[in-house]
């Protein structure tokens, strides 16, 4: 079992420390669903999903602020994404606000935001959207080194009357540049990472989180062909430890937690279902993974409360998802399961041993 001493030791787990929500921009300080209306040439925007050139289209964003008053901002929208852009009936968008207009509003500090929409019309797709949103929120509970999110009950109105209006749940994601400024980080534009270039505590926490949601669609070592490292992980550094890269994950629609109809595990893994957890984390120096596990366990009650308390999640989805999340904590709390399903499956054991041997031989490095 993870000892009580380990659980109490999380105070030394630096990057996972909690940060006052007030340090985030106003939009991301509140987790209640924001009511908003997007009025724009949506059909024109969607029509560019397969185009090499995807233009911004002008529109308006109207929302209800915390005092109950209606506020209107100019916004431009552009289709974005990769797989979902081509596959989904309702592809994701990028919102571009005018900096001069957002001052003094709930959107203070916002410029460009990713908008995540349900893949299709219908209740089931909205529930899947909620589960991806909850994946982001789960990681926010585990560490302040995470993307802020805000749930939105969004009405879409086509300004050209080319399609019918509709209302769906959606959410926006904190911009990379804003995250970097908030955490005083620099984005690392690299093609790949070596094991010794990663910040170990953060990497261990990220990979335990990926196990929680059963996400196999990521990497902390490489990016897709022609893209910066890493796949569905943004790399950052901080000035005082510029040689150590901090991964921050995003895009969780392929996870077992969401269980999208199009999601499937990588062919090289010995599993057939995306909801089957299979640990792909890197082996870590002594104590690092233990501390990360202790930290995750210390957040168990808060994580479960998140899933229990969100009103937009249906009773069926809530019960099924709570059982799935609880089964993850059951692995971490059982010594035999932890050894078999996590510790014995870590990758790069030989590289880690070689690195530790080199450090022991030359302690000045």
Regions found by a protein language model. Name each.
Residues 9-20:
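Hydrophobic h-region of N-terminal signal peptides that target proteins for export
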Residues 19-365:
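Phosphate/dinucleotide-binding and metal-coordinating scaffold of catalytic cores
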Residues 1-10:
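Sec-dependent signal peptide recognition
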